[in-house]
Amino acid sequence: MGRVSQLEDGWYRAMHLGGADSLARQLSRQELYVQQHADTLLLIPRSAPTPRARRYQLRPDHHALLLNRRFDLDVFTIPVKVRPARAGVPVQLNTTFNAAVYLGRRLDFYYLSQQAVTPWHRAARIRATGLGYGAFLGLGSTAITADVTGRAGGPEYEGFVLHAGAATLYDARSFNVGLAAGLDHLLGPDRRVWIYQHRPWVGILFGLDLN
């Protein structure tokens, strides 16, 4: 969860409008175009035939919760893959190079209230939390040995894999981190005997927030 100095103008869903019962009944769960002016929100419903702006004053004893939804495209590394035990080989931890392109749905929650800056002045206080879910596709490497191919005396090398799967993300503002579950497809002649071919693994996604 991070602090935001100014809410960007745009479309949001009003999840909660505290301290304004009549306004909450009219606008709750609606898509609204929101503009922040100091400690006041200007709310314009999407569904209104002739939109009329409503003003919502932020207060220290109540809060507003807004949700912004959008599609998200990012590039991530997968620093850790955990492979379950298989064919007599114990649980494996893969820390070799892995990268992926991620496409998914992003949910940004904004918690807005009012705080005292000085004894004579109050200002908006905004905290933001970003979550996401989606799919990824990428390229990585893995150690190929006789233990994972069953070919005694075979060569040992770093093999290339294509991987794909699903992931959930948390936006820590300066970086993104998430959990992934996927499958690997080994490229090369050992793909038919590799014990992890198309077998599930779980891992961690990590990427810097470049937006």
Map each language-model feature to its residues.
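Predominantly the C-terminal beta-signal and adjacent terminal strand-loop region
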Residues: R173-N211
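Outer-membrane beta-barrel translocator domains and adjoining extracellular loop/strand segments
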Residues: A85-P90, Q115-A116, T145-A152, D190-W194
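N-terminal leader/presequence regions that precede the main folded/catalytic core
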Residues: M1-T77
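Outer membrane beta-barrel transmembrane domains
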Residues: R125, G130-L162
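Short loop/turn motifs that connect adjacent beta-strands in outer-membrane beta-barrel proteins
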Residues: D61-R69, F109-L131, S174-F175
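Transmembrane beta-strands of outer-membrane beta-barrel pores
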Residues: T77-R83, R105-F109, L137-A143, A172-S174, ...
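Transmembrane beta-strands of outer-membrane beta-barrel proteins
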Residues: R69-V75, A99, T129-L137, V177-L179, ...
